[in-house]
């Protein structure tokens, strides 16, 4: 079951039962995914078979060596079974969360827009290439807009960007790396102002994302 809640004034994805499915492995622990030395970037896309999803997942796969100091998760509005069928059961080098019912999409407010209003020039090129390859789409149907999050310990959301068009999301893994670096840099500056006795060497990612606060261990 996917569930979310608000903690204080900060948004967190929190529920002890929150597990997620990938195309090959069901029931993964979301909070274990959030743990780690590097921040986690979550990118919400339309269904896996959508031309924009295919385009950007392909870009991320091709540029994955540039993803240094960060981690990537793509979320698609498709069932794990549908993605597994489309990929013939192949694994991805980064997690692909399959949220067919759209529980996370609904809670986090992933927006929809009508047809061509969401089409950037880049999106038009993607759709043209897909149409030339035999893909058919309804130009008047609502379209999901992308959402980019940087998530810390226990699902704490550190950064959010709601796309204004279907291609308003990180271009590649180098862009994802720069976003996460900026988030960490900004939080480090805030932490230094709050604790001027700390040096750069004493600040770790748990410090920056407020792990102690979420664990209830700080006074």
Functional labels for PLM-detected ranges:
Residues 1-8, 12-13:
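Single conserved hydrophobic/aromatic residue that forms the stacking wall/gate
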Residues 14, 21-23, 151:
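Hydrophobic alpha-helical segments, especially N-terminal targeting/anchoring helices
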Residues 20-27, 130-132:
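Short gly/ser/thr-rich secondary-structure transition/capping motifs
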Residues 99-168:
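Thiol/selenol-based redox catalytic cores and closely related redox-interacting motifs
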Residues 164-185:
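A short, polar/charged loop-to-alpha-helix boundary motif
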């Amino acid at each position: 079951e996917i569930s979310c809640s608000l903690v204080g004034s900060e948004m967190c994805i929190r529920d002890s039962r929150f597990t997620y499915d990938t195309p090959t492995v069901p029931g993964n622990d979301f909070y274990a995914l959030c743990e780690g030395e590097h921040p986690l970037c979550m990118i919400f896309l339309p269904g896996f078979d959508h031309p924009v999803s295919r385009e950007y997942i392909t870009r991320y796969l091709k540029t994955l060596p540039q993803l240094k100091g960060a981690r990537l998760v793509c979320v698609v509005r498709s069932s794990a079974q549908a993605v597994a069928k489309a990929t013939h059961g192949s694994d991805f080098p980064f997690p692909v969360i399959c949220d067919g019912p759209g529980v996370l999409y609904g809670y986090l407010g992933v927006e929809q827009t009508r047809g061509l209003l969401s089409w950037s020039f880049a999106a038009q090129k993607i759709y043209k290439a897909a149409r030339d390859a035999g893909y058919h789409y309804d130009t008047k149907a609502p379209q999901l807009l992308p959402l980019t999050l940087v998530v810390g310990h226990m699902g704490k959301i550190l950064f959010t960007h709601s796309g204004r068009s279907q291609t308003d999301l990180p271009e590649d893994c180098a862009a994802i790396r720069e976003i996460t670096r900026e988030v960490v840099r900004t939080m480090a500056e805030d932490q230094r102002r709050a604790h001027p006795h700390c040096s750069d060497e004493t600040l770790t990612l748990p410090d920056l994302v407020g792990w102690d606060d979420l664990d209830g261990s700080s006074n």
